Every structure is written in C-alpha cells, then in structure tokens.
Amino acid sequence: MPSFDIVSEITMHEVNNAVENANRILSTRYDFRGVEAVIELNEKNETIKLTTESDFQLEQLIEILIGACIKRNIDSTSLDIPTESEHHGKLYSKEVKLKQGIETETAKKITKLIKDSKLKVQTQIQGEQVRVTGKSRDDLQAAIQLVKGAELGQPFQFNNFRD
C-alpha cells in the first residue's frame, strides 16, 4: 500500500547561513552603527538569541532575521518568536526557538483533519512524524493538499513516499 510521512524539519546548515547573512546585513545597516547588536545561533539548543540596546531595535533585528530566513527558503512559521523581551541592564534580548519535529498536539490535529475529510487513508503518529497510508495515490495526494491548505502554525514536508 502506498504511504508517505509528514515531517517538520529545518536544515541547521541553512539556519546557520541565514544567521550569518542577517549579521552581515546588521553590520551594514546605518541605524545599527555604534550599537551593540548581535544575532547568535545555538545549534545544540536549536535557538537563535537576538540582543540589542532597545526594544524597537529588537523588533528590527527580528525583521532582519525573518528576511534572511525567507531568502534561505526557511519558512518564518518555523521560528517560535516570544512576544515578551528579556531586559538585562542596558540590553534587551529574545530567544527564538526553532520548531523541529511535529508535536503530539499538532500530530493529533493533522490526524483529525484527515479523518474528518473522509479520505480513504489511515494515519499513524510515529514520534515526531505522521505516517499516512492509503490504497491509491490519488487519496494520498488529496491528503497532502489538505495538510498543505491547513494553517497549523508550522511548515510541513512530505517524504518517504512508498508504493
């Protein structure tokens, strides 16, 4: 029976390139001259730390980072940006988390979405991915379009196609 997996992965190499590009843009921006502003990637924790001297500049850093991510084909919904900033002395900072894998809650939403559509496919939650199995390729393609059209707060990739 044909099947495929729904996953949500980010290539850390591309994230590293996006952070480097954002830092390069930051060094050429006139409004950040003489200002202590840093964008750092922590690959172990899968976080990006943004630090600068004012709350407004922090929002500008986020816009620079999102722009750099989009240029590297990283979906901006894969960045979990906190609403509140931390304030330490004269510096403001935010720690942006990268969404890797599908959480159980989101996997259950995907499963419910597919089952409610009455498609002739079965879904299984397997850790941080969802396996979709069906009798025909057309049903699987309909399931892919259904998940792509749903706004579930993070980007999904479809891989491991089997016939």
Curated annotation (Swiss-Prot):
InterPro entries: DUF520, UPF0234-like_C, UPF0234_N, YajQ-like_sf. One of its GO terms (molecular function) is nucleotide binding. Keywords: Nucleotide-binding. Gene3D superfamilies: 3.30.70.860, YajQ-like, domain 2 (3.30.70.990). It comes from the Bacteria. One of its GO terms (cellular component) is cytosol. The keyword Aminoacyl-tRNA synthetase does not apply. Nucleotide-binding protein. Belongs to the YajQ family. This is Nucleotide-binding protein MS1759. It comes from Mannheimia succiniciproducens (strain KCTC 0769BP / MBEL55E). The lineage of its organism: Bacteria, Pseudomonadati, Pseudomonadota, Gammaproteobacteria, Pasteurellales.
